[in-house]
């Protein structure tokens, strides 16, 4: 990648964080890098009927209210901190993602702390979009991301978002997501409770999050890409 980036007339990065990483680690000049964000699947932008959501809820035996986490269950996604943060609460956790060896740590913590958790795999894109819409809160305290597409999926699906204050995630989450130190379990616990106990704040942040998500529409990404290509042609 370093050789290709050196030879390229321009380099497209998927976030300002990625741009900084390319400059720092690959020593590519900042002036030849352009940022074009990623979007998400159309399924997350579509509206679902009450009947459709009811079917999804019944199929996966989802609780009436739940905290949602989406992504491969691996160390950098930091799910263990969420499980620890839920200790002593009655807040159900739903996780959609492939299990790795890291899941053993999650199981051990669940057994000790008696956290209510449901783990789902092999979920279709349409079903996943419905699960997002049924969630009370989406949480994504990842330690590092190139961009963080699950955050964008959540913004379009309209649960409020809690995510990390590190890496590129503030770029993806925008002003009205709630941010945590991903290494601070107590901070995560406080932010979860803040939203869980305040439905009005949840609605406000969800509405503002959907407004912010419009910068990640296919149309906007197309315009940004064409701007880069036209720059090369001129």
Language model features: what each stretch is:
Residues 1-234:
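Carbohydrate transferase catalytic cores enriched for Leloir-type hexosyltransferases
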């Amino acid at each position: 990648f370093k050789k290709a980036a050196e030879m390229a007339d321009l380099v497209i990065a998927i976030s300002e964080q990625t741009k900084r990483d390319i400059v720092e680690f690959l020593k590519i000049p900042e002036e030849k890098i352009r940022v074009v964000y990623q979007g998400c699947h159309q399924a997350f932008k579509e509206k679902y009927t009450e009947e459709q959501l009811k079917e999804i809820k019944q199929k996966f035996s989802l609780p009436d209210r739940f905290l949602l986490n989406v992504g491969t269950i691996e160390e950098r996604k930091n799910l263990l901190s969420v499980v620890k943060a839920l200790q002593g609460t009655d807040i159900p956790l739903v996780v959609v993602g492939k299990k790795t060896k890291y899941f053993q740590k999650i199981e051990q913590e669940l057994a000790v702390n008696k956290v209510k958790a449901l783990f789902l795999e092999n979920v279709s894109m349409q079903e996943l979009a419905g699960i997002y819409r049924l969630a009370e809160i989406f949480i994504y305290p990842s330690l590092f991301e190139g961009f963080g597409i699950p955050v964008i999926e959540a913004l379009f699906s309209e649960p409020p978002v809690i995510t990390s204050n590190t890496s590129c995630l503030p770029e993806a989450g925008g002003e009205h997501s709630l941010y945590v130190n991903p290494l601070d379990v107590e901070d995560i616990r406080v932010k979860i409770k803040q939203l869980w106990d305040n439905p009005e704040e949840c609605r406000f942040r969800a509405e503002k999050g959907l407004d912010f998500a419009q910068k990640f529409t296919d149309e906007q990404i197309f315009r940004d890409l064409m701007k880069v290509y036209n720059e090369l042609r001129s």
